[in-house]
UniProtKB/Swiss-Prot annotation:
Alphabetical list of Gene3D superfamilies matching this protein: Cytosolic phospholipase A2 catalytic domain
Presence of keyword Cell membrane: yes
TM segment ranges: 44-64
Main location: other
Biological source species: Caenorhabditis elegans
Protein name stated in the entry: Patatin-like phospholipase domain-containing protein atgl-1
Positions of short motif DGA/G: 167-169
Phosphoserine modification, residue list: S303
Source superkingdom: Eukaryota
Enzyme Commission no: 3.1.1.3
Residues on Cytoplasmic side: 33-43
Active-site feature positions: S48 (nucleophile), D167 (proton acceptor)
Xref: SUPFAM superfamilies: FabD/lysophospholipase-like
Length: 621
């Protein structure tokens, strides 16, 4: 806009997209609301973050409250390890919640026809201008679409009336309505209201989708601050910069007193308006008072709707006040900066000066906090992914064919698992591991043996067999006392001690503890009865030619551990002639020796040999 076209009744404001630099727009809005509120009656355009400020100006939202909201969002972004890139930080979600709170119920009616928002259609990247809204939700959706930066704010673009849109700055970052549009940008360039950057003499610049940006050092800093928020002090200076730049523009257009006039400290005592003016500028709560006070300070000032050519300078103005820009370094802008705008920054600085923030100021604590944040970043990513999936499932109802596919897949996996289970036998193999010393000798513990002996649980058949064995031992002791059994008795073909030891239940337990089992197999038969199968070693070949040789095997086979003896199952029909040694089967802690056909019972066992032998002579646990 040129000075020739600076007619206030025709001026339209246009706020460019700038990310977290929208605090600069807040300073510009504060100056306009205080010194030129008539500019808010026309159209206001905005892209990205500029659309939020434009909506606040039209709906009459308190600028101080809006600034507090901006600082709140910045504080939450800076508290994360990776700032706004942290997966738990939802920028658009926070902005949406705040807009739903601060906007009045009829905001969409106030913005219809006056608020112009620049959008970029996701399908073809064409610019779309929106100025009609059906509800507050419709208005907020348009603002969210204009603020969405791909990958920075998310992956899926938001929708406005069923169509996906992204940041309006991608196609038009500085929307222009007509030649009377006043452009506002936080970047130094050719915009009407922008930082002048007096200390830079760069004449080079770039046009970013309608926004003029000069190649200056400060602009590089501002570009980084767009997406990565700065400290509270930096944001305070940016807001003050916007207030001063807007006030300078209004002064050039004759819509506000000269900056130098506002800083005059001595006013004629005969002019009562001077005292009222200083009081009003210190309070700054009523924009109408400020406008009313500024008129008496002028010798002959036209109204705000008059042309700039009819404007007369104030009594204390010099010849160059209205024709040239005055550097901000030469005036004290902060002296007449509204106090209501200072309060949000003072509160934010006070919060940063707490004891916790003081502890966080130490370098070691900052490094430790950063390291912890980086270490738990993968867990935060996983949690954010789960939340996104949950939100997607809540919003999108999967079709029936997808549910059937997943159900079929689950049934297939479960069926394969059951098939794999059936291929394996459910058994447990126990291998005895004996403790030895440095010389290889087995270490025996009488205490542990007694405890293990107590822990043996016998089945009903084993208990009956144990009673039978004890009854036989009792009979042998009675015969021994009566003198009917002697070592020289011709009827006794066995050594009395060896027969007693081999056939006794205690000897069976001692034998199993002193000899390591090569293999012990526990299984259940078709009747779900637990059975035991064991293999032991034998040192000598034991032929089945005579009963005396078999008896000799009973005496000496228990001490050797050099030869493996195969033990057939109970249902195996293995011929005895094919086996070179008697099978030794251990069931429930007992040893049973299979005799050959030529073997005969000597009658000294105490058991009736004429009694029919049961089919399963083994003892089971």
């Amino acid at each position: 806009m040129t000075m020739i076209n600076s007619r206030p009744e025709l001026m339209n404001l246009s706020f460019s997209g700038c990310g977290f630099l929208c605090v600069y727009h807040a300073g510009v809005a504060a100056a306009i609301k205080e010194y030129a509120p008539e500019l808010l009656q026309n159209k206001i355009l905005g892209a990205s973050a500029g659309s939020i400020v434009a909506c606040g100006l039209i709906t009459g939202v308190c600028i101080s409250h809006a600034t507090s909201t901006i600082l709140k969002v910045v504080s939450q972004a800076r508290s994360r390890t990776f700032g706004p890139l942290h997966p738990e930080f939802n920028l658009l979600g926070i902005v949406r919640d705040e807009l739903e709170v601060i906007l009045p119920p009829n905001a969409y009616e106030m913005c219809t026809g006056r608020l112009v928002i620049s959008l970029t259609r996701w399908s073809d990247h064409e610019n779309v201008i929106i100025d009609e809204y059906r509800s507050n939700a419709d208005l907020i959706d348009a603002i969210m679409c204009s603020c969405f930066i791909p990958l920075y704010c998310g992956i899926t673009p938001p929708k406005f009336r069923g169509v996906q849109y992204i940041d309006g700055g991608v196609s038009d970052n500085q929307p222009i309505y007509d030649e009377h549009t006043v452009t506002v940008s936080p970047f130094s360039g050719e915009s009407d209201i922008c930082p002048p950057d007096w200390d830079s003499g760069s004449m080079l610049g770039v046009d970013f989708n309608g926004t003029s940006i000069r190649f200056t050092t400060r602009n590089m800093f501002r570009l980084m601050a767009c997406l990565w928020p700065r400290s509270t002090d930096d944001l305070s200076r940016m807001c003050l910069q916007g207030f001063g730049d807007a006030l300078r523009f209004l002064t050039k257009c004759g819509l506000a007193p000269c900056i130098r006039c506002l800083t005059i400290q001595t006013i004629d005592a005969n002019e009562p308006a001077g005292r009222v003016s200083s009081e009003c500028f210190s309070e700054n709560d009523d924009a109408k008072k400020v406008t009313h006070v500024a008129v008496p300070r002028m010798k002959k000032r036209a109204s705000a709707n008059a042309l700039n050519s009819f404007r007369t300078r104030g009594e204390s103005e010099c010849e160059t006040c209205g024709d040239s820009d005055i550097p901000l370094e030469e005036v004290n802008i902060q002296s007449f900066f509204p106090s209501i705008m200072k309060k949000p920054f003072e509160d934010a600085v006070a919060a940063e000066r707490s004891v916790f923030q003081y502890m966080m100021s130490f370098r070691l604590v900052r490094y430790a906090t950063t390291a912890m944040g980086i270490s738990k970043f993968p867990f935060d990513m996983a949690l954010a992914f789960v939340k996104k999936v949950h939100q997607y499932l809540d919003m999108v109802s999967p079709p029936r064919w997808i549910m059937l596919k997943f159900r079929g897949l689950a049934d297939f996996i479960l069926g394969e698992v059951e098939k794999q289970k059936s291929r394996y036998t459910n058994f447990s193999c126990l291998v005895a591991v004996a403790e030895t010393d440095s010389f290889g000798s087995v270490l025996a513990s009488s205490t542990m043996e007694k405890e293990e002996h107590k822990e043996i649980e016998l089945s009903e058949d084993a208990k009956k067999e144990m009673i039978l064995l004890r009854e036989r031992d009792r009979r042998r002791k009675l015969l021994k006392k009566a003198g009917k059994i002697t070592p020289n008795n011709s009827e006794n073909q066995f050594d009395e001690t060896s027969v007693y030891d081999v056939d006794s239940f205690e000897h069976v337990i001692d034998f199993t503890k002193s000899h390591e089992a090569l293999y012990e197999f526990h299984y259940r038969d078709e009747n779900q009865v637990m059975k035991t199968f064991g293999l032991f070693t034998d040192s000598q070949q034991r032929p089945y030619s005579s009963a005396s040789q078999h008896q000799h095997h009973h005496t000496k086979s228990l001490g050797g551990t050099s030869r493996l003896v195969h033990v057939p199952e109970e249902d195996e029909d293995a011929p005895l002639s094919a086996v070179s040694a008697p099978a030794v089967i251990f069931h429930g802690g007992q040893e049973i020796v299979e005799l050959g056909e030529s073997d005969k019972d000597s009658g000294l066992s105490g058991i009736d040999t004429k009694r029919k032998v049961p089919d399963e002579p083994t003892t089971r646990f």
